[in-house]
Design a protein with these regions (language model features):
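Nucleotide/pyrophosphate-binding catalytic subdomain
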Residues: 1-5, 9-231
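A short, hydrophobic C-terminal helix/tail in secreted or cell-surface proteins
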Residues: 231-237
Length: 237
């Protein structure tokens, strides 16, 4: 509830990822979607797998006491899986559905990333067109939720960034709207001075330069996707 009030009061654009693990041995929704896609692609019955994913989202909806349903979305997803939708489409549903829930919860407009994040026909990312689409779409949009991790080609084919790509989407939105501040909320408490799996209770880094941020990201720090640096540095957000 506190996070909701913070978003409504101070934040204009929110870019969510797919639901992660609820506990250590849990499975991330993205991995569940990939597994469901594999079953569908192999001609196997994937109904139970998709129902389990639906249940995960319903748990979130119920926990937020929302009068909101994803039933029709899952009907469409099942149909698309049956019609051999690609792996990128399957994986992207994690962010898309989570974005719809968050938009309903915050009272923000939902903007599908497929409409504003553009990939070329060869699957490469189109930075220039994306910036134009985002700028034009959001200029008259006071608040919005834009799901991370994916976009689409001009023909509507869904394409994803690499894992952790919601950070990239967030940086693209920040650049497009010339944001004064970009925040990256995650389950990790900032950048740490050492690997917490090796060093017990390492201190966090309070201030970091763009160069240090890039180096830590490329070295494997999972707080921020390495590619996000490029867009943030361009605007010095």
């Amino acid at each position: 509830r506190r996070q909701r009030q913070m978003c409504i009061r101070d934040r204009r654009y929110v870019v969510p990822s797919a639901p992660g693990k609820r506990f250590p041995k849990d499975t991330k929704v993205t991995d569940m979607l990939y597994a469901c896609y594999e079953s569908a692609a192999n001609g196997e019955d994937f109904s139970e797998q998709l129902d389990n994913i639906h249940a995960r989202y319903q748990e979130i909806i119920d926990g937020l006491n929302l009068d909101f349903s994803l039933d029709l979305d899952f009907v469409q997803i099942k149909e698309n899986f049956s019609n051999k939708a690609g792996a990128d489409y399957a994986a992207s549903r994690g962010e898309c559905l989570n974005g719809k829930i968050m938009a309903a919860y915050l009272g923000f407009e939902f903007v599908d990333a497929a409409e504003v994040v553009r990939f070329n026909d060869d699957g490469s990312f189109n930075d220039e067109v994306t910036n134009t689409l985002l700028s034009e779409r959001l200029q008259d949009c006071k608040t919005a939720v834009i799901p991370g991790f994916y976009g689409a080609k001009k023909d509507g084919t869904i394409v994803t960034f690499s894992r952790g790509g919601s950070d990239i989407t967030g940086s693209l939105v920040a650049l497009a709207v010339q944001a004064d501040l970009y925040e990256n909320w995650t389950d990790v408490s900032g950048f740490l001075i050492a690997d917490p799996r090796i060093v017990k209770n390492p201190k966090s880094i309070e201030t970091i330069t763009y160069k240090e941020l890039r180096e830590l990201s490329y070295m494997g720090a999972s707080v921020l996707h390495a590619v996000s640096y490029t867009h943030l540095r361009a605007h010095e957000t």
